[in-house]
Amino acid sequence: MAEANFHLGLQTMKVPMSLHAENRKRLVTELQSKAAGSIVLIQGGESETLHSTDRERLFRQESYFHWLFGVKEPDCYGAIDINTGKSILFVPKLPESYLVWMGKIHPCEHFKELYSVDEVHYTHQIASKLEKLKPKSLLTLHGLNTDSGNHTREAAFDGISEFTVNNEILFPIITELRVIKTAKEIDVIEYANKISSEAHKEIMTHIRPGMKEYQLESLFQHYVYARGGCRHVCYTCIAASGDNASTLHYGHAGAPNDKTIDDGDMCLFDMGGEYYCYTSDITCSFPANGVFTEQQKGIYEAVLKSNRAVMEACKPDVSWVDMHLLADRIQLEELKKLGILQGDVEEMMKVRLGALFMPHGLGHFLGLDVHDVGGYLGVERKKEDGLKSLRTTRNLKENMVLTIEPGIYFIEAIIRQALNDPTRACFIVQEAVEQYYGFGGVRIEDDIVITETGCRLLTDVPRTVEEIETHMAAGRNANEKVLL
């Protein structure tokens, strides 16, 4: 009998359900010495409607639940017996009306085979089925996501008050396991990177001055879904041109990628497709017309040098804070060479001048969430400018997956503030930096996995100035018609 898997046909990836069985086994191994006799109980994501209407949101599974069970349906629960490793899925018993509006109602056996779990029951049976197992306690998930500031949703069901509940043990253990990826998980993340990389290359091929930013966003979304089965993107697409590229999270509801792209604009496209809930996060920066000006080339190559230096230095036991500082130092050195800054770079580092041009952190964990969990397990957040925006301050470990995304941005209002601060103004060549007002910014974001001796690049897009110009020129020669 063939192994159960998730697969969307055509050229999309088959993901084996053994990925989740391996995750459950890892969790049981960690819990056996700490909570023998207990049962893990976790609640999946719920179906919901939009505001006060009956319009359903497009469902996306809760990440911890997906990590353990890989279930695509909403309103489910999962349990794992720590003593035996037995996996139990609880699915809702659907009303007969579901058959008319939503389709076939499957029996429990269907879900047992689909997700390769040991048992499947209905959610209204949770209390009775768990009571028969006589658990020492139920381990529920409760903890803080340090990226969002939100807590995980703790499982609840009718009858839970009859059980001893422990909500302290599970969160730090399962979160740390999510930080260190298995080979099967890395394969899916690499697939998401592959299809997203191709979509970014498609954008470089088809972009033309005069188009709207959202048209390129649309092209990306179409490509990753049509070619790769990525129904979801991992975050709101950033399709920024010109000065919009200096807004770190451009593309939101108040600025919905709606500018007309001008000839001469520098573009910054930060987009990632999501496959089977596993994410990618790639940023490409390039000139709208396919040819870098000297000004654009100087800033771009400064960021690329920073990106590649960090990539070369990443390996187990290296501090992520040190990687951020390395990126800062290189970019300050390059800005000095371009005549935008002056003075001693080490003195610039002391006043955190790098945060003026790169106010965000160097990168973040990547996995089932684009800003993946575990960044501040057992470590403290830094307080200095720039460093306080890091999403982790941990040392690197083998099989961590992270983004490397240095950037240089010319945010006029922030630069003008710095020019009024004597401790920073002394390093800024005012007449030079003013030539970059309206430039926007450059970010180069790649996804990597830490290996035994270094790191492996998962992203595959043109990166040097020559590669980008060659790729964009070839696209123009092969496709003279503008894609609308």
Located regions from the model:
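Active-site neighborhoods and metal-handling regions in enzymes and metal-associated proteins
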Residues: M1-L484
